[in-house]
Amino acid sequence: MHNAAPITRRKSTRIYVGKVPVGDGAPIAVQSMTNTRTTDVEATVNQIKALERVGVDIVRVSVPTMDAAEAFKLIKQQVNVPLVADIHFDYRIALKVAEYGVDCLRINPGNIGNEERIRSVVDCARYYNIPIRIGVNGGSLEKDIQEKYGEPTPEALLESAMRHVDILDRLNFDQFKVSVKASDVFLAVQSYRLLAARIDQPLHLGITEAGGARSGAVKSAIGLGLLLSEGIGDTLRISLAADPVEEVKVGFDILKSLRIRARGINFIACPTCSRQEFDVIGTVNALEQRLEDLITPMDVSIIGCVVNGPGEALVSTIGVTGGHNKSGFYEDGVRQRERFDNEQMIDQLEAKIRAKASMMDESQRITVNLVDK
């Protein structure tokens, strides 16, 4: 029920990764990356399908060898989500996966080789109508840039990116996006700001090697949150030393928190104190697990007492305010006569949320049908 965020998106050109639009005002796409051995086709396919179930838009797959390229061909045949091939060192692998139907090629300027090799990749991408991501990383800058700057700096990352943007410009190839990732939040943020001011292409955001599930999520939320709030960014990936499924969940949570893109339930819950009238923490944890399958955007407030509960419920799709034995229930900001038994809170609230989601989905379907006529 909250209004969309007052964020003006940076204007950019548009490309397509498979059927997913990127840039020029398209919804910010959430990306992840497999961490299986690509040659283990079954494990990789299973992981990609798990990512699909939580709503991933694009998946990157590392293709380090020709054997992995052959495996990639089989993987591509078994999944629906667009796949980006992550290519380092051997440009010939890019040519092979292009032949096998890859949806985007990620190349690293720090190790892909000279301009002739890049030309070969570009010619192949043009032939198969495949976009490219220039993926600059603070940990693998070109040797001459490392020597020039001494350490990764925003200017160093920008120079690496612009060197390869200029090559693609000379080759008259404009179907690309760019990233300038670093593990340091401030380094990454400033690098992206500099790049956003220089080019019109879409930008892929990320804090590389951010860390484990908790610390990595915090770093990514700070860094990407800063950039997204400034309108910078067209796709994103949360890099975690964790299950890739968690990357997708955190990515959507960041977009949801900034009200840039809504998917699923935005839970608003108090941290609890001695005034709580029911188990708020247990209720929220249980509902987050039970309702992971819902994609209908809605705000659900779960507040343990009457101090802030009514106010939060007024601006929520579904709201609960703790009371003695029974708690108040709100729908679309209106207090209902029905009250929830505190001992049955989880089951009752789940039923109400699912019913509301079904109504909202049906309403949207009817609207679409009327427009089509």
Swiss-Prot record:
Family matches, as Pfam families: GcpE
GO biological process per UniProt: isopentenyl diphosphate biosynthetic process, methylerythritol 4-phosphate pathway; terpenoid biosynthetic process
Reaction(s) this enzyme catalyzes, per UniProt: (2E)-4-hydroxy-3-methylbut-2-enyl diphosphate + oxidized [flavodoxin] + H2O + 2 H(+) = 2-C-methyl-D-erythritol 2,4-cyclic diphosphate + reduced [flavodoxin]
Keyword Iron tagged: yes
Pathway this chain belongs to: Isoprenoid biosynthesis; isopentenyl diphosphate biosynthesis via DXP pathway; isopentenyl diphosphate from 1-deoxy-D-xylulose 5-phosphate: step 5/6
Protein name (record): 4-hydroxy-3-methylbut-2-en-1-yl diphosphate synthase (flavodoxin)
Molecular function per GO: 4 iron, 4 sulfur cluster binding; 4-hydroxy-3-methylbut-2-en-1-yl diphosphate synthase activity (ferredoxin); 4-hydroxy-3-methylbut-2-enyl-diphosphate synthase activity (flavodoxin); iron ion binding
Cited InterPro entries: Dihydropteroate_synth-like_sf (IPR011005), Enolase-like_C_sf (IPR036849), IspG_bac (IPR016425), IspG_bac-typ (IPR004588), NO2/SO3_Rdtase_4Fe4S_sf (IPR045854)
Coiled-coil zones: none
Function: Converts 2C-methyl-D-erythritol 2,4-cyclodiphosphate (ME-2,4cPP) into 1-hydroxy-2-methyl-2-(E)-butenyl 4-diphosphate.
Sites where the protein binds [4Fe-4S] cluster: 270, 273, 305, 312
Domain of life: Bacteria
Originating species: Pectobacterium atrosepticum (strain SCRI 1043 / ATCC BAA-672) (Erwinia carotovora subsp. atroseptica)
EC number(s) reported in the record: 1.17.7.3
Alphabetically ordered keywords of this record: 4Fe-4S, Iron, Iron-sulfur, Isoprene biosynthesis, Metal-binding, Oxidoreductase
